[in-house]
C-alpha cells in the first residue's frame, strides 16, 4: 500500500459491545476508588501502562481484554454520534 492510499480499520460489532461494557465497568471501579476516571483512562489509552487502572473489581484485567485502539474507537464513535449535528 502506497503513502497516498488510505488503509481501512474495522472492529466487529461484538468487540464494539464489549468495549462499551469494559469502559463503563472500568469507569465505575475507578470512580468508586476515588480516582478521576477520565484522567486515569486517558493515561492508560495513551501510554498502554495498566497501572493507571485500579485492580479494584478486577478493572485492570478487564480493561486489558481489548486493545487500546478498540477502546479509543468506541470513545470516538460515541462522541461523534452524540455531538455531530450533520446527518450521516
UniProtKB/Swiss-Prot annotation:
Domain of life assignment: Bacteria
Xref: InterPro entries: IreB (IPR009309)
Family, similarity comment: Belongs to the UPF0297 family.
This protein's name: UPF0297 protein Ccel_2240
Source organism: Ruminiclostridium cellulolyticum (strain ATCC 35319 / DSM 5812 / JCM 6584 / H10)
Taxonomic lineage of the native organism: Bacteria, Bacillati, Bacillota, Clostridia, Eubacteriales
Amino acid at each position: 500500500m502506497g503513502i497516498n492510499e488510505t488503509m481501512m480499520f474495522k472492529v466487529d460489532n461484538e468487540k464494539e459491545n464489549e468495549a462499551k461494557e469494559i469502559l463503563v465497568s472500568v469507569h465505575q471501579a475507578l470512580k468508586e476508588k476515588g480516582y478521576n476516571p477520565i484522567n486515569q483512562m486517558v493515561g492508560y489509552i495513551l501510554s498502554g501502562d495498566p497501572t493507571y487502572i485500579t485492580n479494584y473489581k478486577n478493572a485492570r484485567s478487564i480493561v486489558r481484554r481489548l486493545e487500546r485502539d478498540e477502546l479509543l474507537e468506541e470513545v470516538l464513535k460515541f462522541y461523534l454520534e452524540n455531538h455531530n449535528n450533520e446527518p450521516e
